[in-house]
């Protein structure tokens, strides 16, 4: 390479880029060309302002000017000073007026007003006049615009240490707290200056005080003035005595204690005085005295605290445990064991069957479980007994019983195998009522009422009777076993079993098994035994503990065999007898079975009978009593007869206004009297019964104000509670004892007396019905009847009657017709009822009905009240003003309150009425924290209650527990609860809501929701007005307060679904001021705002779950499985089907289906997929390939989509900037850059051209300036690039 010499520029080649740069520079500097370079315009003729003041110059086209009047007039010269406003005045062009700013005056506002002339500064302040205002310079102690305010020098709290500041004029004074002084209480007073501490005590100054340090002085007290008593602090331990000295003390110790303060407890046990392992106990230990485990007797005392005691182990004794004790001396070995004495102990040698330290334990041979095959082991002394199951026997149940093999028992008998003395056998266990080797003999027989059977049995030293029986009778003799001296009787008394042992006819012992009725007709097993002076009664019954009841008692001497009623050495037994009727079986005396053929008397084999009370034979609810072979009906009054079909006839007194009466003659009735009868009447007064002797009444029973009263001579009246004049039948029963009765007299009057005036004292003659009159259970008939006996009992005698009507007959109460306004009358007993037409109601159809006329407009409904109506409706409230009602015209009692509401407000008022009379005249109900709260006349609802702010309807009912009481608890029923909730505290009534001074009742304060029916007592609140032109005639009702706003009728929640808040097509459901969205399958969330993940619950049993756009899922199954959830295995298919191997792969059939041999690069059950699909890079535009279940998937990069990422996304995006405002400058910048780049390229090309290639100087260069100056300059050698 040749050397490069200096660049040589030609005069014409370098001018072009310079010209181009100059051009660009001129274009850039053109907007900033100075205005001076532009030729000036010709000056106007008006520039010199040639016109007079008040006129303005106007140039003309000819180059001259004219002076015209100016709109500024005289203001053109700015005559007004100090910022005043100048306004021209009138036609005179030189006139003007100045409007001064505040603080100046004069024609030209040239005068400054002196604001200090009025002396505004107070308290000697100096006034400084300023423009438009003044300024006060205040003296010390004052401040403010006019020095009007006195400065509070105490505001800066100058007084320290809690001092009090007293403000003055321009000053302050501090009142210091005790212990401080100074102008600002900054000085702490030194109380030690007076040297208050005596006896050399050191004084320490405190705030408002001092403290004396009396250490090492021998003195104490606040000023060290008292001598210290060293013994006062009880320095001596262990109850030692203290001797006081000056600044010293001395302790006198008890024996066993030492030390300066007697604090050392001398250890007497340190020398180990107790031998043979004895425990040494010091007497100075207080824990060893008193208590349950005390070692030393009595209470602890320091006077006896010296010394020790040895607690010796077993086998040793003495003060130091040096003596060996003979443990066998006390005979410790039990149950025949022999004792051997040992050092510090003994050894017992036990008899067989016992063990333990003292042979106290009976060895349980059953612990080894010797009984086989489920046998039960019972321990005995030195042995055991096995209770074997039925199939096994032997000592340890090891022998299988075979006695029943090849043998059968007839009927219902059970074969029981046996094993005795090594031999197998069997016996038949017979069911009850049978006997014999093969249970072929019947032991059951019957005994009828009024007869008995008997037999003889051998006598024995002991006595036992066992039998089974059944009966339905309450009482009767079951069995009697006796000899000439003694008898044992088994009876039923009130259906209860009882055993009686008698001697010489006198009962010696009676045993009873109470509370078990045995007359139920079932079989019962009973046993009674007399053995070793004890009588025992047993009963097998399911009502007994363990199904066995036992009663027993001692007998002085048991019965002995003596000369019996039969042959010598026998007992007589009697079964049945008297009223007993029933059956017996398995009767045994001392184990001897009595068969029916061995008995004498009327013996009926078997136990056959028909249920006499089936079907029920007793009418009118009569009780059927089973008497074994027949029945008896216990009839309710007033029925009687064998089957209760006959009714005792009633007697009607006073029918049609007649005067009725009946009488009976009496004889001796005994000391007691019971009167009973049926009564039916609607009259509140009248004579019922009167016992009299001639004209003197001894006992009178009568009606007074609907109550039954009984009055006798010398006794206070008796009143039966309740009312008896309601027209219903009542059974009346009166009982009198001997102390309540005197001579009743000879006659009984019923319903009246034969002279009506004689009954006025007791309400007059009776009107009504009397039936089944009985005296001491003796029936007194009002009418003769074939049912009555022909002869009267000795206590009574037939009397006479007047104007009685048989049967209980009613008056014709519908004649004349009592029903008004077309009502139909219907007769009831001595009363009537009316069926009214549509527009009338009431007992006699006299009250008008308003609601059929539809006086209320929908949605309100009409509700009838006395003499009128009320329009009730549901109403909607939206935080508006409350609805106000008043009950000033209500006089009836308000028994309670009902209220229905629904809301979602957690804080809202429901109802309120507050008076100045106190808590018992207030009521409020509200929703607090979502629960019901309130105060009802002083009773407070318990909190918290159930949540009610849930948008559902809730119904509240409040009532007093005792309505008539002055103060009572209030009870709350919420939403129809069966059990009320009691409010806390006693409350008054709701009387403050009614009458002339009624307290206004406010509904729905700050309430959003609906109110339903609201009622106080029987008066609903009229939330809706009646139809126009309709007026309710109700005398008592609540009315809306004048000016109370009208309510919005109907219950409507807010428009929560309009517009619908549910996204993505969800359906909005209105839940009353709340909503719920029913989302489609692809969405979820409160507003369907969350895309649902159908794969969240892993629905696919196998394979992978993929979410579909419609919100459902799709399971992509692995090979070999199919179905919506990949649950089902793919069924085998043959090679001859269409769905076999793909791409010509050979197919091989087998028992499990087809098997395809896939070509290279293919895979799958049918060779339907690529073996390694991602190796071919199927994903375009930078997508990522992955394999799932043998199929490839492409995960595309941003901006692409599709199966192979081949689709370019063309979603338009909004421009974040204005296009034109950015594009034009950008284009200009690009153009400029292009020009600069072009220029740079040209220069670079020129440079390359100059520095590369072969250099040939041109003609101009040869004749250039450098050659022309050869004679002057030394030209360097030329260099050229070769």
UniProtKB/Swiss-Prot annotation:
Residues 1246-1282 are annotated as: Interaction with EPB41L5. In the adult eye, strongly expressed in the outer nuclear layer, containing the cell bodies of the photoreceptor cells, and in the inner nuclear layer, containing the cell bodies of the horizontal, bipolar, amacrine, and Mueller glial cells. Also expressed in some cells in the ganglion cell layer (or may be displaced amacrine cells rather than ganglion cells). SMART domains: EGF, EGF_CA, LamG. It is a single-pass type I membrane protein. The gene is Crb2. This is Protein crumbs homolog 2. Its main location: membrane. The keyword Lyase does not apply.
């Amino acid at each position: 390479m040749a050397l490069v010499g200096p660049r040589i520029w030609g005069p014409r080649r370098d001018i072009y880029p310079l010209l181009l740069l100059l051009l660009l520079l001129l274009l850039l500097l053109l907007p900033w060309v100075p205005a001076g370079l532009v030729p000036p315009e010709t000056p106007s003729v008006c520039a010199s302002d040639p016109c007079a003041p008040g006129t303005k110059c106007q140039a003309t086209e000819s180059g001259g000017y004219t002076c015209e009047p100016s709109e500024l007039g005289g203001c053109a010269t700015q005559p007004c000073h100090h910022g005043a406003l100048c306004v021209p005045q009138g036609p005179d062009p030189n006139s003007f007026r100045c409007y001064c700013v505040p603080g100046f005056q004069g024609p030209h506002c040239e005068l400054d007003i002196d604001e200090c002339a009025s002396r505004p500064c107070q308290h000697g302040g100096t006034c400084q006049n300023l423009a438009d205002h003044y300024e006060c310079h205040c003296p010390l102690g004052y401040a403010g615009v006019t020095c009007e305010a006195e400065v509070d020098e105490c505001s800066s709290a100058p007084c320290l240490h809690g001092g009090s500041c007293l403000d003055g004029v321009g000053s302050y004074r501090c009142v210091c707290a005790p212990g401080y002084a100074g102008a600002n209480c900054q000085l702490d007073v030194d109380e030690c200056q007076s040297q208050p501490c005596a006896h050399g005590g050191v004084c320490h100054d405190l705030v408002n005080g001092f403290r004396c340090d009396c250490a090492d002085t021998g003195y104490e007290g606040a000023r060290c003035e008292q001598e210290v008593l060293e013994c006062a602090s009880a320095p001596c331990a262990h109850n030692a005595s203290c001797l006081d000295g000056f600044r010293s003390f001395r302790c006198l110790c008890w024996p066993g204690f030492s030390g300066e303060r007697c604090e050392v407890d001398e250890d007497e046990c340190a020398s180990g005085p107790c031998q043979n392992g004895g425990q040494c106990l010091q007497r100075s230990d207080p824990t060893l005295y008193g208590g349950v485990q005390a070692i030393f007797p009595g209470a602890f005392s320091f006077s006896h605290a010296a010394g020790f005691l040895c607690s010796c182990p077993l086998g040793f004794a003495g003060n130091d445990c040096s003596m060996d004790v003979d443990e066998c001396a006390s005979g410790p070995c039990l149950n025949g064991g022999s004792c051997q004495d040992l050092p510090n102990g003994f050894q017992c040698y036990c008899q067989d069957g016992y063990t333990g330290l003292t042979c106290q334990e009976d060895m349980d041979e059953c612990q080894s479980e010797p009984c086989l095959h489920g046998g039960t082991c019972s321990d005995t002394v030195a042995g055991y007994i096995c209770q074997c199951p039925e199939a096994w026997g032997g000592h340890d149940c090891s022998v299988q019983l075979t006695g029943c093999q090849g043998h059968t028992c007839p009927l219902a008998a059970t074969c029981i195998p046996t094993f005795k003395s090594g031999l197998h056998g069997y016996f038949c266990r017979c069911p009850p009522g049978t006997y014999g080797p093969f249970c072929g003999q019947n032991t059951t027989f019957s005994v009828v009422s009024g007869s008995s059977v008997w037999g003889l049995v051998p006598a024995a030293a002991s006595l036992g009777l066992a039998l089974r029986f059944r009966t339905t009778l309450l009482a009767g003799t079951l069995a009697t076993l006796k000899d000439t001296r003694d008898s044992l009787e088994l009876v039923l008394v009130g259906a209860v079993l009882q055993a009686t042992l008698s001697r010489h006819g006198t009962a010696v012992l009676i045993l009873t098994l109470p509370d078990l009725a045995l007359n139920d007709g079932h079989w019962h097993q009973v046993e009674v035994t007399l053995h070793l002076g004890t009588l025992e009664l047993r009963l097998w019954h399911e009502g007994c503990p363990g199904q066995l009841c036992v009663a027993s008692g001692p007998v002085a001497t048991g019965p002995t065999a003596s000369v019996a009623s039969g042959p010598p050495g026998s007992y007589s037994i009697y079964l049945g007898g008297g009223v007993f009727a029933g059956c017996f079986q398995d009767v045994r005396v001392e184990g001897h079975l009595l068969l029916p053929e061995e008995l004498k008397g009327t013996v009926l084999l078997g136990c056959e009978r028909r249920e006499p009370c089936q079907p029920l034979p007793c009418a009118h609810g009569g009780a059927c009593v089973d008497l074994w072979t027949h029945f008896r009906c216990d009839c309710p009054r007033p029925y009687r007869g064998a089957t209760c079909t006959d009714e005792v006839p009633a007697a009607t007194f006073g029918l049609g206004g007649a005067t009725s009466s009946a009488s009976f003659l009496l004889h001796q009735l005994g000391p007691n009297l019971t009167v009973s009868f049926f009564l039916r009447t609607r009259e509140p007064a009248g004579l019922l019964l009167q016992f009299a002797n001639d004209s003197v009444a001894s006992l009178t029973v009568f009606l007074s104000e609907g109550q039954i009263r009984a009055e006798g001579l010398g006794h206070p009246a008796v009143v039966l509670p309740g009312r008896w004049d309601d027209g219903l039948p009542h059974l009346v029963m009166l009982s009198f004892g001997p102390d309540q009765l005197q001579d009743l007299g000879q006659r009984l009057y019923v319903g009246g007396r034969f002279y009506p005036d004689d009954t006025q004292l007791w309400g007059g003659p009776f009107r009504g019905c009397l039936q089944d009159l009985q005296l001491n259970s003796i029936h007194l008939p009002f009418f003769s009847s074939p049912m009555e006996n022909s002869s009267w009992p000795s206590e009574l005698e037939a009397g006479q009657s007047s104007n009685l009507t048989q049967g209980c007959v009613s008056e014709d109460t519908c004649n004349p017709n009592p029903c008004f306004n077309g009502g139909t009358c219907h007769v009831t007993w001595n009363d009537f009822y009316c069926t009214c037409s549509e527009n009338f109601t009431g007992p006699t159809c006299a009250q008008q009905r308003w609601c059929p006329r539809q006086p209320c407009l929908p949605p309100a409904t009409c509700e009838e009240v006395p003499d009128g109506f009320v329009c009730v409706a549901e109403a909607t409230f939206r935080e508006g003003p409350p609805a106000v009602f008043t009950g000033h015209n209500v006089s009836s009692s308000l028994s309670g309150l009902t209220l229905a509401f629904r809301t979602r407000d957690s804080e809202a008022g429901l109802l309120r009425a507050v008076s100045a009379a106190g808590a018992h005249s207030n009521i409020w109900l509200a929703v607090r924290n979502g629960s019901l709260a309130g105060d009802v006349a002083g009773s407070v609802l318990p909190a918290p209650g159930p949540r009610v702010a849930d948008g559902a309807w809730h119904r509240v009912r409040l009532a007093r527990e005792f309505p008539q009481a002055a103060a009572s608890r209030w009870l709350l029923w919420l939403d129809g609860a069966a059990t009320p909730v009691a409010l806390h505290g006693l409350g008054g009534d709701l009387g403050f809501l009614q009458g002339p001074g009624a307290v206004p009742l406010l509904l729905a304060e700050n309430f959003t929701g609906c109110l339903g029916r609201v009622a106080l007592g029987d008066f609903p609140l009229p939330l809706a007005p009646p139809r126009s032109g309709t007026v309710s005639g109700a005398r008592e009702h609540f009315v809306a307060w004048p000016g109370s706003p009208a309510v919005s009728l109907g219950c409507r929640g807010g428009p929560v679904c309009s517009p619908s808040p549910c996204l993505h097509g969800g359906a909005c459901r209105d839940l009353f001021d709340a909503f719920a969205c029913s989302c489609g399958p692809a969405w979820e969330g409160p507003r369907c705002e969350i895309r649902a993940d159908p794969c969240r619950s892993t629905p696919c049993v196998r394979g992978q779950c993929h979410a579909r756009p419609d919100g459902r899922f799709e399971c992509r199954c692995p090979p070999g499985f199919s179905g919506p959830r990949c649950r089902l295995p793919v069924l085998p298919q043959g090679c001859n089907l269409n769905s076999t191997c793909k791409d010509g792969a050979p197919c091989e059939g087998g028992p499990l289906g087809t098997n395809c041999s896939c070509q290279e690069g293919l895979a799958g059950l049918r060779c339907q997929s690529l073996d390694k699909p991602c190796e071919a890079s199927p994903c375009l535009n930078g997508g990522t390939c992955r394999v799932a279940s043998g199929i490839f998937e492409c995960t595309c990069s941003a901006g692409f989509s599709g199966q192979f990422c081949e689709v370019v996304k063309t979603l338009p995006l909004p421009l974040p900037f204005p296009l034109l405002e950015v594009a034009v400058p950008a284009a200009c910048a690009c153009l400029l850059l292009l020009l600069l780049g072009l220029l740079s390229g040209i220069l670079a090309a020129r440079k390359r051209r100059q520095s590369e290639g072969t250099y040939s100087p041109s003609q101009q260069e040869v004749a250039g300036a450098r050659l022309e100056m050869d004679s002057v300059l030394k030209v360097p050698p030329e260099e050229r690039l070769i």
